[in-house]
């Protein structure tokens, strides 16, 4: 039984990976990135999440390696703390309490026991760079209140701050100003570019800055796409700068290589540019990276780069400008038109992704599985261009079919509308376009749904539109003369007094179709397409419509724009009950009778879980989110929970996810955020908490078979070998972090000694009597050996202190031959 705990709202993934620059480990094996309240540690080779560092109570705003120990990581947050982590083991070492909001973090090897952070001044839009001294203490929580002012009136973005020439100076940019602070002189030089007010069409605004690691050179990016290289900036009057120009739009980020021989730049062109020797002639390109480059990072070893993109993606790039790995998070589109769907096959969350794409996102591993290109056109990044939007999507026939709707409307009278139907192909394990229908309706499509009844003989799709009609589309096999191809055709067109059709849905058994026409709900027979009855409460236009399920399949629910939730009984064709509730999201659970409704109020969003047969809610939780909730979906559980409390039983078979206006993906759980967000590799344990890797699933059965054969062999040989998992030396060898292990010579001797057999295992008394005749002979020889052993012991007790040298007896030779026959191949499996 599950221990009863309070249900809490937890973030289940989808946080921004591109919020801050990613940071490489010293050996380039790991990459760290900010993800909401957490810091995620990814492998640069496998792209898998190795650790999730959780402990901050607010948004993490900066991460940096500890310059004095490259196996440790600093992080800062809006919660006013700086935390020190051991990222190898995922352990929090120490917390420094600063006490004010921290917006960025910087470290310098030259500044011992100090870090640099960006904090708020008195006014909310004015920030300053300060140095924080980290006191040495044995306690895990330490107050760090000693702040030293460095620079004032700076930008809060860490891209606008850079330390140069091994910490000799720090540069900061804001608007049209460049400030350089020299630590030894404790002086500040300021440089100004002409503003757009003084020069026509000028876009000299600073957007980012980077400093040469060993020379006095500052690179600044600008709104007009230019890169300026500043030199001789020790003198306010004799400074010089040169321009590099390739980007047609603003420069988003800059980064020097470790040696400083090349400069990396990126922007909205989705192209990484490498300026070698900082000249116009020597530049290399890595194009088609898929989205705007937000950040650029360089590994301390210099062998890897990485770019963070606006589509919540991190690309790891080799020194020769070849992409080697992609870490893709939940893509946050400008607006989610399709809502949240669940792919019946993969149980992946499906919603709008990149422009014109559907993204399939794994809720278990918090990573994107793949993208499906729906529009199949090249995306042009232009602010004034009206793009084709993917507005609707729905799965049908248990994942065998996918329907999508795309539209583009430049003027009210110029509507481009397309509906596409995709068939799942088992060979390619993906969706293939089957039918494309131009202008399926004369106006925008408001809803579409499949008939997903188990007994449905023919796939059926219904679309509703503002043109006042709903259309029924069926799959036919007469699309060519050979009848080998299938396609979708319109089978029926229905309307109700030319009202706009706003919603549609099928009953659980597929026998009825409900279509809402503004304030009126109509019920149609799905066989004859005859109108059965209508419901009209005049409570406003129907916003949401759904049938009850299982024992509540006789009920139909509708939520109106005026804040009324209605429940109709289909058997009596009458209103069962209604409630005043401003429902923004209403989703039925596919595995139970429960329905989740999220209402919007001036304070925030509230959750109500109820059954249509009972107007009293099963569960109510106020204030699940301060912002507006846009979409929700139930996801069936692979392994049901076993909550006994009536208030929590709605979570037994399915889990409810919802998406807020800021596109934060949240869910309800009794587990803490740490337990909820622990990666799969930490949940599946094997062999004393060793993580289950993909190789384990490939070789696991083979290992088990080998172990079984080994056990049989050992039983036949009647020799009891020690269990390796119970040997402290081996456990210590396998579980101790590599950086704290002793030398290999010491480990080797300790390991070999731990495998040696004790004399007790060779005792003749432990050998059964019902063995074969050969073993009985050996037992007689062992008696002689015991006599010989007693003589040797008597001799050794004479106190002479000399080594006794003797020849092996026949019984000893037989015993050695016996050990030669033992299969020691199990050692190789360690």
Curated annotation (Swiss-Prot):
Component of the proposed t-UTP subcomplex of the ribosomal small subunit (SSU) processome. SSU processome is composed of more than 70 proteins and the RNA chaperone small nucleolar RNA (snoRNA) U3. The modification N6-acetyllysine is found at residue 466. Disulfide bonds: none annotated. SUPFAM superfamilies: Quinoprotein alcohol dehydrogenase-like (SSF50998). PANTHER family: WD REPEAT-CONTAINING PROTEIN 75. Keywords: Acetylation, Isopeptide bond, Nucleus, Phosphoprotein, Repeat, Ribosome biogenesis, rRNA processing, Transcription, Transcription regulation, Ubl conjugation, WD repeat. Residues 769-787 have a biased composition (Acidic residues). Its main location: nucleus. GO terms for biological process: positive regulation of rRNA processing; positive regulation of transcription by RNA polymerase I; ribosomal small subunit biogenesis; rRNA processing. Residues 763-806 are annotated as: Disordered. GO terms for molecular function: RNA binding. WD repeats lie at residues 4-43, 47-86, 90-131, 145-184, 193-231, 237-276, 279-318, 324-362, 376-423, 430-474, 487-525, 529-569, 574-611. Ribosome biogenesis factor. Part of the small subunit (SSU) processome, first precursor of the small eukaryotic ribosomal subunit. During the assembly of the SSU processome in the nucleolus, many ribosome biogenesis factors, an RNA chaperone and ribosomal proteins associate with the nascent pre-rRNA and work in concert to generate RNA folding, modifications, rearrangements and cleavage as well as targeted degradation of pre-ribosomal RNA by the RNA exosome. Involved in nucleolar processing of pre-18S ribosomal RNA. Required for optimal pre-ribosomal RNA transcription by RNA polymerase I. It comes from the Eukaryota. One of its GO terms (cellular component) is nucleoplasm. PROSITE patterns: WD_REPEATS_2, WD_REPEATS_REGION. There is a cross-link at residues 123, 427, 676 (Glycyl lysine isopeptide (Lys-Gly) (interchain with G-Cter in SUMO2)). Signal peptide: none annotated. This is WD repeat-containing protein 75. It comes from Homo sapiens. The modification Phosphoserine is found at residues 664, 672, 779, 782, 796, 811. It is found in: Nucleus, Nucleolus.
């Amino acid at each position: 039984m599950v221990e009863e705990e309070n249900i809490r709202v937890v973030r289940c993934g989808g946080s921004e990976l591109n919020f801050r620059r990613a940071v490489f480990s010293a050996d380039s094996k790991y990459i760290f990135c900010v993800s909401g309240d957490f810091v995620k540690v990814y492998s640069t080779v496998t792209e898998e999440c190795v650790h999730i560092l959780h402990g901050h109570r607010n948004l993490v705003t900066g991460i940096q390696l500890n310059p004095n120990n490259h196996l440790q990581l600093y992080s800062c947050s809006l919660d006013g703390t700086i935390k020190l982590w051991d990222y190898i083991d995922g352990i929090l070492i120490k917390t420094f309490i600063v006490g004010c909001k921290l917006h960025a973090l910087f470290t310098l090897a030259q500044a011992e026991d100090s870090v640099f952070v960006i904090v708020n001044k008195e006014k909310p839009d004015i920030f300053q760079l300060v140095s924080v001294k980290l006191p040495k203490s044995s306690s895990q929580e330490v107050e760090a209140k000693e702040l030293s002012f460095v620079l004032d009136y700076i930008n809060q973005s860490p891209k606008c701050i850079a330390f140069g020439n091994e910490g000799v100076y720090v540069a900061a940019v804001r608007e049209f100003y460049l400030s350089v602070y020299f630590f030894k002189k404790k002086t500040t030089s300021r440089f100004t570019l002409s503003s757009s007010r003084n020069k026509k069409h000028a876009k000299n605004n600073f957007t980012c800055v980077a400093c040469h690691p060993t020379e006095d050179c500052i690179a600044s990016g600008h709104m007009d796409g230019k890169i300026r290289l500043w030199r001789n900036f020790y003198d306010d009057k004799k400074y010089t700068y040169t321009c590099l120009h390739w980007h047609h739009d603003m420069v988003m980020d800059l980064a020097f290589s470790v040696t400083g021989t090349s400069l990396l730049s990126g922007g909205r062109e989705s192209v990484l540019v490498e300026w070698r020797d900082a000249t116009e002639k020597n530049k290399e390109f890595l194009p088609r990276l898929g989205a705007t480059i937000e950040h650029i990072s360089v590994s301390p070893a210099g062998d890897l780069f990485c770019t963070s993109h606006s589509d919540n993606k991190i690309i790891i790039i080799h020194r020769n400008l070849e992409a080697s790995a992609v870490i893709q998070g939940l893509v946050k589109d400008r607006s989610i038109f399709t809502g949240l769907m669940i792919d019946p096959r993969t149980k992946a969350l499906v919603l709008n992704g990149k422009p014109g794409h559907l993204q399939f996102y794994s809720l278990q591993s918090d990573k994107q599985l793949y993208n499906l290109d729906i529009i199949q056109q090249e995306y042009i990044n232009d602010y004034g261009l009206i793009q084709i939007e993917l507005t609707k999507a729905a799965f049908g026939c248990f994942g065998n079919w996918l329907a999508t709707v795309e539209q583009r409307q430049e003027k009210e009278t110029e509507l481009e509308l397309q509906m596409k139907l995709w068939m799942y192909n088992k060979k390619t394990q993906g969706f293939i376009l089957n039918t494309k229908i131009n202008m399926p309706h004369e106006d925008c499509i408001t809803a579409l749904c499949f008939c997903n009844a188990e007994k449905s003989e023919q796939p059926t799709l219904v679309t509703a539109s503002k043109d006042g009609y709903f259309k029924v589309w069926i799959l036919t096999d007469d699309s060519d003369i050979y009848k080998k191809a299938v396609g979708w055709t319109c089978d029926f067109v229905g309307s109700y007094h030319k009202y706009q059709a706003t919603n549609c849905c099928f009953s659980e058994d597929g026998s009825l179709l409900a279509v809402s026409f503004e304030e009126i709900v109509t019920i149609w027979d799905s066989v004859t397409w005859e109108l059965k009855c209508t419901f009209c409460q005049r409570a406003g236009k129907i916003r949401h419509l759904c049938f009850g399920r299982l024992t509540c399949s006789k009920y139909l629910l509708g939520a109106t724009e005026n804040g009324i939730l209605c429940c109709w009984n289909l058997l009596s064709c009458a209103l069962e009950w209604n409630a005043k509730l401003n429902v923004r999201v209403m989703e039925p659970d596919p595995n139970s009778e429960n329905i989740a409704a999220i209402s919007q109020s001036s304070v925030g969003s509230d959750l109500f879980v109820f059954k249509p047969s009972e107007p009293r809610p099963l569960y109510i939780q106020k204030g699940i989110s301060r912002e507006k909730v846009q979409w929700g979906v139930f996801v069936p559980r692979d392994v049901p929970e076993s909550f006994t409390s009536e208030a929590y039983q709605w979570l037994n078979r399915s889990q409810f996810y919802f998406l807020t206006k800021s596109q934060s993906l949240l869910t309800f759980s009794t587990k803490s955020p740490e337990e909820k967000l622990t990666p799969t590799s930490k949940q599946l344990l094997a062999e004393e908490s060793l993580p289950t890797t993909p190789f384990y699933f490939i070789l696991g059965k083979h290992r088990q078979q080998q172990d079984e054969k080994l056990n049989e062999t050992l039983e036949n040989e009647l020799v009891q070998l020690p269990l390796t998992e119970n040997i402290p030396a081996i456990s210590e060898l396998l579980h101790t972090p590599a950086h704290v292990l002793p030398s290999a010579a010491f480990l080797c001797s300790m390991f070999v000694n731990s495998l040696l057999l004790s004399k007790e295992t060779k005792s003749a008394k432990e050998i059964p009597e019902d063995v074969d005749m050969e073993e009985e002979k050996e037992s007689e020889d062992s008696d002689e050996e015991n006599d010989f052993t007693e003589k040797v012991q008597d001799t050794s007790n004479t106190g002479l202190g000399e080594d006794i040298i003797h020849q092996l007896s026949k019984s000893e030779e037989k015993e050695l031959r016996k050990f030669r026959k033992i299969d020691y191949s199990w050692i190789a499996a360690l």
